[in-house]
């Protein structure tokens, strides 16, 4: 019989093995990485670096809402380099592949939802305070080459991805090689795709949608402050018209 509780506990054996495999003893005993549930590690050949001083639980793997993906397992093939900041959450059903010469950077307060895929052949950076929804794919490579039959030109199959600070990537989106986004970008799901540099071409705090994604709305930002969300929810329980705020946008939106 399926044991729900077993999926919700820290996997002590995998947590110990992971930390003592990738960190020096002085850091491993702090257990900077905590692993829940079943988590397959395909390769221990790579290395992990931290953006801040290693401390307890700075990266949490396989943590999730059991309603969404209770039976999904995560997979890590780490041949290259994984760089993590503080308070990074990677939810259940994650598939991460980091090639030998590649780097994946997850900055402070990055949250990656259930059943996502990240394949890194070159370099992928996800900026601080960025949230990623479920079932989204990041690939910085086309994996194969194509030739222009008239010019004979063959372009590289790999190109880095750089997701800006405080982005919100919706569920069921695709982030392809060469994608670069400004601060505060929202990529609406499902089925939006980005594969180019938007920095300097669109303002910060834009909502993108489509395949390929284009600007749909400007001057829009996700509200991450829990108290603010409660205030807005209470407003809509009693009103049909939009909520109007005239104070400081930063304090209104930032997590508390």
Language-model features: where?
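Extended serine/threonine-enriched, polar tracts that run as long, contiguous segments within proteins
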Residues: 169, 175-178
